[in-house]
């Protein structure tokens, strides 16, 4: 079997690692890929949004299965284009990927189908949003750009002044582009944040293990929000009681709601949950594997990923017994100094050969590329250093030990 993976981050590297373990796979390609993915796949310099080129490449290479890792091409309809060309593809079609592509849509869906989430209002007029903030809002309050914004389109505002500035940033200054044409104003929730990834075949949903990520750029949970500076799995706060509640009131109801709306979802749904004093509530949906959550979840999965992916496409997920190792994993993101604001690229990285010598250590590349034979930095989040352990404490110690194998002038890590 020939498999094509679409994307270039640590998530896609983790997917490529899992695909490479399958006995069913003879050859892996990746567009555009990165320096780490190149260990497992032949990378082609085609951007994830160059749909025509991706379809042509898949036909030329006689690809049997495409796995789309990134949110932008999913929301843009890459799966539809590949399927129209007769190519088997894992991921939601455009009309289902809206679950992530529009926060206003997802909030309205949850409201309609009684899926627990924070109270909210949607706005397309900034003047009406500000009027609402002045007359109805309780602070702190959350402002969310409706569309995709690289995980950075959420502002937590402590008072009216900050909220008015936030409306200006999102809707008038268009800091997040067209993602800010519509905005969600949402009640601020407190509690533990947990991520749960799931496989979905349109009817059946099978959850993977839980994870928790660390979004702040600085040590000690300080600094700006990022796409994710580290993560661990499983979450000690995701208890059996929470799992039972979410299966009954969140997971299956979401799949059923999308089907009822004529938008059957096949692929991965990422549930961002807040464990509040009133019970679990949905913070957000993503229509793909999380990044860096995939880097701690996929190494713990016992199943052949190809079996699971094909079951999702074929609607036979109910026949899969999804299993995970009884251990823990921690991922530490090594980011360029200055991320997420301003940072240099092209800085050399060394020490990567050492990872293959250690059982249970993984180095997933995010922002890397080749400069001749040298691997150099090519983004804000550079590497995801992952390690397993019998429990979270051991896994964390192993992950930081693994970080010592890596050297670069760019290093900045989450603690």
Predicted regions and their residues:
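ATP-binding N-terminal substructure of ATP-dependent carboxylate-amine bond-forming enzymes
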Residues: 1-94
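Active-site nucleotide/adenylate-binding loops and adjacent lid/helix of ATP-dependent enzymes
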Residues: 4-5, 100-182, 212, 236-252
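Internal nucleotide-binding/catalytic subdomain
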Residues: 157-294
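Short, well-ordered beta-strand elements within core beta-sheets of diverse protein domains
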Residues: 231-234, 333, 381-389
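Active-site "cap" helix and flanking loop/linker of ATP-utilizing ligase/carboxylase catalytic domains
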Residues: 246-269, 286-358, 371
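Short, well-ordered alpha-helical segments
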Residues: 389-403
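Single conserved hydrophobic/aromatic residue that forms the stacking wall/gate
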Residues: 406-415
């Amino acid at each position: 079997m020939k498999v094509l993976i679409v994307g270039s981050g640590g998530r896609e590297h983790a997917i490529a690692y899992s695909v490479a373990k399958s006995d069913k796979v003879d050859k892996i390609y990746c567009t555009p890929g990165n320096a780490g993915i190149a260990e497992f796949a032949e990378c082609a310099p085609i951007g994830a949004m160059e749909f025509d080129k991706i379809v042509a490449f898949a036909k030329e290479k006689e690809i049997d299965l495409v796995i789309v890792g990134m949110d932008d091409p999913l929301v843009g309809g890459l799966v539809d284009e590949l399927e129209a060309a007769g190519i088997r593809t894992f991921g939601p079609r455009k009309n289902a990927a809206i679950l992530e592509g529009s926060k206003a849509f997802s909030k309205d869906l949850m409201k309609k189908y009684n899926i627990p989430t924070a109270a909210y209002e949607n706005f397309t007029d900034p003047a009406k949003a500000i009027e609402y903030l002045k007359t109805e809002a309780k602070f702190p309050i959350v402002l969310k750009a409706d569309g995709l914004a690289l995980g950075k389109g959420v502002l937590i505002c402590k008072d009216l002044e900050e909220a008015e500035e936030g409306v200006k940033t999102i809707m008038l200054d268009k800091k997040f582009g067209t993602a800010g044409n519509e905005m969600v104003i949402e009640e601020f929730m407190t509690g533990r944040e947990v991520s749960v990834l799931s496989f979905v075949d349109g009817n059946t949903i099978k959850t993977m293990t839980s994870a928790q990520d660390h979004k702040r750029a600085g040590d000690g949970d300080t600094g700006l929000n990022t796409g994710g500076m580290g993560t661990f799995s499983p979450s000690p706060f995701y208890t059996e009681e929470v799992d039972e509640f979410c299966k009954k009131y969140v997971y299956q109801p979401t799949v059923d709601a999308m089907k009822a709306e004529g938008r059957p979802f096949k692929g991965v749904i990422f549930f961002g949950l807040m464990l509040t004093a009133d019970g679990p509530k949905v913070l957000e949906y993503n229509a793909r594997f999380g990044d860096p959550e995939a880097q701690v979840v996929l190494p713990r999965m016992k199943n052949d990923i190809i079996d699971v992916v094909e079951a999702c496409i074929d609607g036979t997920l109910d026949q899969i017994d999804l299993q995970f190792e009884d251990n823990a994993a921690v991922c530490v993101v090594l980011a360029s100094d200055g991320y997420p604001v301003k940072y240099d690229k092209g800085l050399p990285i060394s020490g990567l050969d050492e990872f293959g010598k250690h059982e249970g250590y993984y180095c997933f590349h995010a922002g890397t590329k080749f400069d001749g034979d040298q691997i150099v930095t090519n983004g804000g989040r550079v590497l995801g250093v992952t390690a397993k352990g019998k429990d979270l404490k051991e896994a964390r110690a192993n992950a930081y030990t693994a970080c010592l194998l890596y050297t670069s002038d760019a290093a900045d890590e989450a603690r």
